Amino acid sequence: MRVAILLGIFLSLVEVKAQSAVKIYEDLKKLNFLGSVLYLAAHPDDENTALISYFANQVHAETAYLSLTRGDGGQNRIGNELGELLGVIRTNELLAARKIDGGQQFFSSAIDFGYSK
């Protein structure tokens, strides 16, 4: 009886995440490669999505992109957002790109002080 109760409590606390066969297969292929890649750039628009995708999906390396800023000091030719609002847009763009290319996204706390040319 106690075992059944403990098992019931344990199973209610464990989060079961359903994965497709393709996702499981891709995760298994990553076990055959030991290594990681960190792509580092100053601004969100300096990323190389093709390279990140190659390392994440073909080489099966643990791959991440570190953007030193969130792009809040950049220019915006297609909208009115500047400053922090532009940084929010650029941040969401990078997070969406990582969902597609399979990399992880990281940011530093550096502040983008604007266009310098």
Regions found by a protein language model. Name each.
Residues 2-13:
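Bacterial N-terminal signal peptides
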Residues 14-18:
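Sec/Tat signal peptide C-region and signal peptidase I cleavage site
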Residues 19-117:
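Active-site rim/loop-helix segments in enzyme catalytic domains that contact anionic ligands
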